């Protein structure tokens, strides 16, 4: 997961966030029918576009916000990478949800922004953080409280849960259930970092609450779309005889 440092410095590679337009892959290709060979050649005055690849991680190591070099399978990068995966899963779910015209797309986009803040906190291990880094290592409680408000809002409109439900309820609902499962894995990756004091405890609280939100929203989405939820039924082995 990429986290941009002050002044646009790339701290970790992966997602470009707000700076993605600097990457040629995300820029407009210009008028249709114009081939690359027909484009005007850049002059010496054309500003250089920074490359997406740095080659600094080719040996299996990457840098934290604090400048510390760690193996890419370090607990920090496991946690950062899983929260990035979660944000990507939410982005996919948002595309399905937007097609149905659901109004809570903005909530999910806000959550993606909060996950960028989570990544920033995770990528700033407190054991190597200096005073200037501490603002990146803190995750405020505001997003947690907001999730609780959203959960309560949707829960009041849902029928009571009387049985275990399976991930189901249509494409949008199933995508949100998948996001919930990824969120639980992200939480498991973060717990060791909190237990060792490397990361703000609010990060785990946020992910824990987020999984509850995603579960509730999946149920709410199925209800609004009129799709039935599949109920868990224990397999009866006696039926096979």
From Swiss-Prot:
ATP binds at residues 54-63, 72, 184-188, 208. Its EC number is 2.5.1.-. GO terms for biological process: cobalamin metabolic process. The keyword NAD does not apply. It holds the Pfam family Cob_adeno_trans. Converts cob(I)alamin to adenosylcobalamin (adenosylcob(III)alamin), a coenzyme for methylmalonyl-CoA mutase, therefore participates in the final step of the vitamin B12 conversion. Generates adenosylcobalamin (AdoCbl) and directly delivers the cofactor to MUT in a transfer that is stimulated by ATP-binding to MMAB and gated by MMAA. Homotrimer. Residues 27-69 are annotated as: Disordered. It catalyses: cob(I)alamin-[corrinoid adenosyltransferase] + ATP = apo-[corrinoid adenosyltransferase] + adenosylcob(III)alamin + triphosphate. Belongs to the Cob(I)alamin adenosyltransferase family. One of its GO terms (cellular component) is mitochondrion. Gene3D superfamilies: Cobalamin adenosyltransferase-like. The modification N6-acetyllysine is found at residue 224. It is found in: Mitochondrion. GO terms for molecular function: ATP binding; cobalamin binding; corrinoid adenosyltransferase activity; transferase activity, transferring alkyl or aryl (other than methyl) groups. The modification N6-succinyllysine is found at residues 205, 224. Keywords: Acetylation, ATP-binding, Mitochondrion, Nucleotide-binding, Phosphoprotein, Transferase, Transit peptide. Residues 1-26 form a transit peptide. The keyword NAD does not apply. The modification Phosphoserine is found at residue 128. InterPro entries: CblAdoTrfase-like, CblAdoTrfase-like_sf, PduO-typ. SUPFAM superfamilies: Cobalamin adenosyltransferase-like. This is Corrinoid adenosyltransferase MMAB.
């Amino acid at each position: 997961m990429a986290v941009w440092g002050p002044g646009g410095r790339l701290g970790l590679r992966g997602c470009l966030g707000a700076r993605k337009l600097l990457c040629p892959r995300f820029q407009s290709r210009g008028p249709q029918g114009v081939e690359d060979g027909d484009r005007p050649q850049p002059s010496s005055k054309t500003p250089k576009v920074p490359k997406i690849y740095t080659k600094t991680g080719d040996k299996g190591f990457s840098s934290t916000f604090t400048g510390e070099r760690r193996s890419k399978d370090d607990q920090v990068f496991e946690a950062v990478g899983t929260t990035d995966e979660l944000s990507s899963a939410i982005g996919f779910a948002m595309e399905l949800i937007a097609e149905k015209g659901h109004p809570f797309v903005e909530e999910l986009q806000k959550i993606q922004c909060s996950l960028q803040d989570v990544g920033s906190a995770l990528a700033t291990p407190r054991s190597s953080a200096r005073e200037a880094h501490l603002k990146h290592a803190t995750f405020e409680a505001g997003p947690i409280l907001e999730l609780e408000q959203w959960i309560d809002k949707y829960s009041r409109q849902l029928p009571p849960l009387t049985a275990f439900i399976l991930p189901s309820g249509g494409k949008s609902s199933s995508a949100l259930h998948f996001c919930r499962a990824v969120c639980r894995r992200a939480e498991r990756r973060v717990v060791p970092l909190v237990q060792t004091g490397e990361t703000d405890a609010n990060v785990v609280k946020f992910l824990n609450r987020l999984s509850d939100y995603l579960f509730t929203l999946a149920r709410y989405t199925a209800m609004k779309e009129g799709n039935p939820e599949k109920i868990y039924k224990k397999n009866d082995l006696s039926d096979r005889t």
